[in-house]
A protein has these predicted regions:
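Hydrophobic alpha-helical segments
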Residues: 1-207
């Protein structure tokens, strides 16, 4: 999601607004001061844009700071590669039927993390050709679908595939981030400011 420490990208083409008005008002970067302004600067440096989701988070700078810090820590010091992180995000977004998060992570997954369009689509289904990524997605799918309940058999399979307890904790952290951003984007009713991807795309044969 927004504020990942990656090279700036061209401003994505924006789809037609979906909502007549947001439920939570985004903070205008031009009017931001203090810590909020600094966080916006860091976000723009990373992404080349300041997404609507970050602007909504900025209503509470502590939340925005915490989100940025967690995402930055996982991205720079975590054990999961960028492509695996984006696969998890795509899976969680699809399970949540989150068009906002799907739009963000399809763009980031294919433009930043190096996923092909086919790999991004497979990730939404919880599938991957790489055995390691497949094991990660299998566990992430269990976490998001069963609300954190993971069977002994599932954990045994994860460990057999080479995942440590540390990996499991890190995967759950990424799932939680995806759930948080989905709920915030949905509650705020913000417009999608990334190239639009709908959770129904593959049902219509367009994914």
């Amino acid at each position: 999601m927004p504020a990942l420490p990656t090279p700036a990208l061209p401003t994505p083409a924006l789809p037609t607004p979906a909502f007549p008005a947001p439920a939570l008002h985004p903070v205008d970067p031009e009017k931001a001061t203090g810590e909020t302004a600094s966080l916006f600067t860091a976000t723009h440096r990373a992404l080349g844009v300041i997404p609507q989701l970050a602007r909504v988070m900025a209503n509470n700078p502590t939340v925005l700071r915490g989100y940025v810090d967690v995402v930055t820590a996982l991205s720079t010091r975590g054990t999961l590669s960028a492509d695996v992180r984006e696969r998890i995000a795509l899976l969680v977004a699809q399970e949540n039927r989150s068009d906002y998060c799907l739009s963000v992570h399809t763009f980031r997954g294919t433009k930043v993390a190096g996923l092909t369009t086919a790999e991004a689509t497979r990730a939404r289904r919880g599938e991957a050709g790489d055995p390691w990524a497949a094991a990660v997605l299998d566990l992430a799918a269990a976490v998001v679908r069963d609300h954190g309940v993971v069977s002994d058999e599932r954990l045994d399979a994860a460990r057999h595939a080479g995942l440590s307890d540390g990996h499991v904790v890190e995967i759950i952290a990424h799932v939680a981030l995806g759930v948080f951003t989905h709920h915030l984007a949905t509650a705020a009713r913000i417009d999608i400011d990334w190239p639009l991807v709908r959770h129904t795309d593959w049902e219509n044969g367009t994914a």
